[in-house]
Amino acid sequence: LKCNKLIPLAYKTCPAGKNLCYKMFMVSNKTVPVKRGCIDVCPKNSLLVKYVCCNTDRCN
């Protein structure tokens, strides 16, 4: 699986076991992702942070 880094022109291949890509947004500003990368389990959203997870190459 390949996931985009913070700047979507760059991406990385995920290590074994991390088979989801994710984007993290601040709830107050949903237009600009704060973090992107590979993850094993999609984190729960909180009052401050929203996560979007997916499982295809460069989907984040």
UniProtKB/Swiss-Prot annotation:
Subunit details: Monomer, or heterodimer with alpha-cobratoxin (AC P01391); disulfide-linked.
Family note: Belongs to the three-finger toxin family. Short-chain subfamily. Type IA cytotoxin sub-subfamily.
Annotated localization: Secreted; Target cell membrane
Source organism: Naja kaouthia (Monocled cobra)
GO molecular function: toxin activity
Keyword Secreted set for record: yes
Matching InterPro entries: Cytotoxin_Cobra, Snake_3FTx, Snake_toxin-like_sf, Snake_toxin_con_site, Toxin_cobra-type
CDD domains in the cross-refs: TFP_snake_toxin
Tissue: Expressed by the venom gland.
Keywords: Cardiotoxin, Cytolysis, Disulfide bond, Membrane, Secreted, Target cell membrane, Target membrane, Toxin
GO CC, one annotated term: other organism cell membrane
GO biological process: killing of cells of another organism
Disulphide bridges: 3-21, 14-38, 42-53, 54-59
Name of the featured protein: Cytotoxin 2
Function: Monomer: shows cytolytic activity. Heterodimer: has no cytolytic activity, but retains most of the alpha-cobratoxin capacity to compete with alpha-bungarotoxin for binding to Torpedo and alpha-7/CHRNA7 nicotinic acetylcholine receptors (nAChRs) as well as to Lymnea stagnalis acetylcholine-binding protein.
Top-rank taxon, per record: Eukaryota
Record flagged with keyword Transmembrane: no
